Amino acid sequence: DIVENDEKLKLQSFLKKWLDTKITCELDSLFKLKNINSVNSQIRALSYQLYENNGVVKRDEVLNIVNSLSQDERKTLRNLGVKFGRYHIFLFKLFKPSVVSLRILLWKNFKGEDLNLFPPTFGLNFVNDLKYRNKKFMLLCGFEKFDSFFVRIDILERLFIEIINSNENKSDKIKLLPKMLNLLGCDKESFVKVIKLMGYKVFEEKNETFFKYKPFKKVKKSLDLKIKKDNPFEALK
């Protein structure tokens, strides 16, 4: 009340301009996907799914779309910041700490609920804490759920590359190495539990731990292409 009306309007105008600029800059890659101009229906379909899911989708949920994309079409999306990972397709720029904080604020403001949810401490790659139970919120923060564990999605991709590189002789078994534990930032017991949940069989040979891929049988999910009205970023221009 002590601020004069014209000064209040100037302040409101300044704050709105500042916020609009921050949103535009921080979420630039998301807006580029929303406004993508492509005649290719598969590029548009994947862009739509990424936009509707706030920059990250599980690869197996959009597998048909991904498999139909040529290398040139993937390059088009990569140039917009899309990362094609083993487990997820995501906009990697959206998982920087400052961008995660902004997206969470927008998400909470739009939902008007779950205001007591906060992301894990930035810098953590592995979380095993019962206070983190909201799977959708944690994926928004960049973490994938494995039972009671959460692992950062970009770290999952690095782990997958590490597994490939560790299997130089192309055998069906991979030796568990200390650098794999260091990458996730967890102990061996937790790593073994997570790797099993990822579809690997773990076994011991000569006092050493190995694992090999034994994928679970999955039921195919149909893709929902209906426009959602509860996307927290839909109102942003």
Residue ranges and their predicted role:
Residues 1-176, 183-188, 193, 201-202, ...:
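Acidic, serine/threonine- and proline-rich low-complexity intrinsically disordered segments
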Residues 181-185, 223-226:
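Short, flexible active-site recognition loops that position polar ligands and cofactors
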Residues 203-208, 232-236:
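Short, surface-exposed, charge-dense and proline/glycine-enriched linear segments
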Residues 209-213:
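Minor-groove-contacting beta-hairpin "wing" of winged helix-turn-helix DNA-binding domains
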Residues 216-222:
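Short, charged/polar, Gly/Pro-enriched secondary-structure boundary elements
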Residues 223-237:
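Short linear clamp-binding motif
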